[in-house]
Design a protein with these regions (language model features):
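Nucleic-acid substrate recognition interfaces
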Residues: 1-430
Length: 430
């Protein structure tokens, strides 16, 4: 399994001008390569013969540029420039794959028509630079730095990773992110027969239920909401002061960057806690609810929609997946349509959206903020009801069933965000 160590390089850092220069040269090579590929596509479309010429591949592009001694390619180390054109080639292939999926009406995975890769801005554009382990020096720097391209650049990268596989310089919001990618060993998957499910939301960021009767655990999302709302106000205020013909500024980029870093920090705390918690509970598999296009089609009201779409749930899921996998726990993304509407207590059938049953009738309903009422008038937490239904769906996909008699509805809430994922604190929630 691969993990990433990230270093944010802001203006004023000694590596900033080097990163800026490399990504600028990478942009020039990207634009030059894209131009050649576009020309080959135009020639193919103009051709009237039955056997049309093929679109220029990235390998052919590398050979052509080397033969011509193309200036943008010579401006970068050979292996680095090759990787840039390779990434461009993969982007072109991805475009055609997505376009094929968009025109395939039987495949609903691609809902919006993809756009062909575009040229980057001549002066402001920057592009990703990737260094494989073939460009690393065998010797480290005086302070343990990883040395990239020792013959050409001699670029020192501060890292604690002993055996990195790849290094990327990614331009992001007027800054650069140096990503050091490395491999980690994965623990053997558990086979305990105990399962958990997570329902993601706004007020309750993660509502966890369990198959063995353990009380549900609610991780509150109040701090995430507070961060979003605070930065939304600051960004709106900054935008109101911009000239009419200006869309953004360095100050706004700085606000977006700080917002992302704070959200990343909070999500890391939560996912670290949950992965340790599931490990201590001997959970074999975790089902986490997610629907295709859920952020594009959400209809929860204007204010809640804004908060829901701004919370990086995909980041949360990816963090939880690799942290649980490191502990031998598998995380499965489970389709969750109708799980919030169906009554878990009344054992309602939970259909799948888009199979002709959109008008399905359910025994209970949501009656107030955060509460669900069953057919017999029993009130329970609405997110707990949804989480249990996700658990039912997940187990059904495995050919198993949930013992509903063991289900507990007495929730425990995790409100303190200043926690560290350790076993001493964990005992308070078990």
């Amino acid at each position: 399994m691969r993990q990433v160590e990230r270093h944010w390089i802001k203006e004023g850092h000694y590596l900033y001008p080097i990163c800026d220069d490399l990504t600028f040269k990478a942009k020039n090579l990207y634009n030059a390569g894209l131009y050649q590929i576009r020309q080959s596509i135009f020639e193919r479309n103009k051709c009237q013969e039955e056997e049309k010429p093929s679109v220029l591949s990235w390998t052919e592009l590398v050979s052509q540029f080397r033969k011509e001694k193309q200036g943008d390619m010579l401006a970068l180390p050979s292996k680095v420039s090759t990787n840039i054109l390779k990434i461009l080639g993969f982007s072109i292939n991805s475009y055609y794959q997505l376009l094929k999926g968009f025109h395939d009406k039987s495949n609903p995975s691609v809902t919006n028509k993809p756009r062909f890769p575009r040229y980057l801005h001549k002066t402001e554009g920057r592009y990703v630079v990737e260094f494989t382990n073939q460009t690393f020096s065998k010797k480290r720097g005086s302070n343990g730095e990883l040395i990239l391209c020792p013959k050409d650049l001699k670029l020192p990268i501060p890292t604690k990773v002993e055996d990195p596989q790849c290094v990327r310089i990614v331009p992001k919001l007027n800054a650069f992110v140096i990503e050091v990618i490395y491999n980690v060993e994965v623990s053997l998957l558990k086979h305990t027969g105990t399962y958990a499910a997570i329902d993601l939301g706004v007020d309750n960021l993660a509502s966890s239920t369990f198959s063995d009767g353990v009380n549900p655990l609610l991780v509150k999302g109040t701090k995430i909401k507070s961060i979003n709302q605070g930065y939304n106000r600051l960004i709106a205020k900054a935008k109101s002061k911009l000239p009419a013909n200006q869309k953004t500024s360095q100050g706004i980029h700085r606000l977006w960057r700080n917002r992302e870093l704070k959200l990343q920090s909070e999500l890391h705390k939560v996912t670290s806690f949950l992965s340790l918690y599931f490990d201590e509970m001997s959970i074999e598999k975790v089902f986490i609810g997610k629907n295709q296009g859920w952020k594009q089609e959400v209809t929860l009201g204007k204010k809640i929609n804004q908060t829901f779409t701004q919370i990086p749930f995909t980041t949360f899921i990816s963090q939880l997946i690799y942290k649980c996998l490191a502990r031998g726990i598998e995380v499965v993304e489970q389709e969750e349509s109708y799980t919030s509407k169906a009554s878990f207590v009344d054992q309602d059938e939970i259909p799948t959206y888009g199979k002709g049953n959109e008008k399905f009738a359910f025994s209970g309903k949501r009656v107030s903020r955060g509460m669900y009422r069953t057919k017999n008038g029993f009130l329970l937490n609405a997110d707990v009801n949804g989480s249990y239904n996700i658990l039912v769906k997940g187990l059904l996909a495995l050919g198993k069933s949930l013992d509903r008699e063991k289900a507990s509805f007495h929730t425990r809430s995790l409100k303190n965000w200043q926690f560290v994922a350790n076993k001493d604190l964990l005992l308070q929630y078990m």
